[in-house]
């Protein structure tokens, strides 16, 4: 329920790999904004149609599953400005789908080799793709408050997916620059950035002490060492690594799906792309893949064709994620993935899962210790370990942090909204103060 009264000074947006959220910043409070169905999270999925429609959020998936099979044959297409030879799809295949569903775009923000995608004789820069989601969230905020919202504090990972461990690397600098550009394209006139774990710290309990803030999301793991005192919040160290919950999904694909379907018979490059949704996007856009699978032949190739070309790839990979989530509350999970032409059922144990992701957990442990060392803190100095992010509910992750800081209190922040609430808090601080000074 929203409080009445007041004009917001800005907003905070947590743009995530899987989900995104927005919070309005008022001079006296911060409100996370729900959609009409009462949901704070908007899936970070995009629907693109050849007729010009650009849709973000839950509606994107609904539209694609209704029309994703529709195609236009070259010769009947009027979108290529200089004729069909101007169109990549014509040069490659002779037809194209009328719509596309994109997800995990955030994972490509810092990819120096990825400028965007192409469909219907048009380039879609990655900044334009991100701007669709940011525009969706800005409009949600404006509907909630009845005012124009042109200021935003955008969260960003300490280290972007695929960008290496140095926050100052060219790839990470590019990721932050692209976020700013996307926000401007979405209609924001004033844009500030804030590291996601720092934002989560702003939203947490403000009791004095040293806090290890661990933000384990879908795309990255970020950690902040914070110290709260009567004078305020001090950020003593920030670190991160491009290991997120989606990497754990990939491990399940490697160790459960691939053996069950015999996919290890495939070329290694193809199997590597199949592990992730971002890889699947590239495969589905490759006009030569169908003919390659036909040449390879065999059960594995037929399984891949069923996954990619039945119109149900998204549901297939969400089933893998669902099994991972179920293992956070149960000792075993049933991985049920069914698409036309393919039915897979496998029982996965938590023991198998935790053994399989041990290398990723070791990486998280090393990054956390590195952050503490950079802050000049010993593990016994930590008063509170605060965890946030959708992947922070994984029991093995929480055990790792308990073992690292056994004397600290483990506090579970709001897994999906603590970052956006903190970004809203930062927006309130920045622009309430600035407006007071200039008013």
Please place each PLM-identified region on the residue numbering.
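Phosphate/pyrophosphate-binding loops at sites that engage ATP/ADP/AMP, CoA/4′-phosphopantetheine
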Residues: 137-152, 365-383
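Phosphate/oxyanion-binding active-site loops and adjacent basic polyanion-contact surfaces
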Residues: 97, 101, 122-134, 244-249, ...
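Glycine-rich phosphate-binding/hydrolytic loop that grips phosphoryl groups
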Residues: 45, 192-204, 249-255, 359, ...
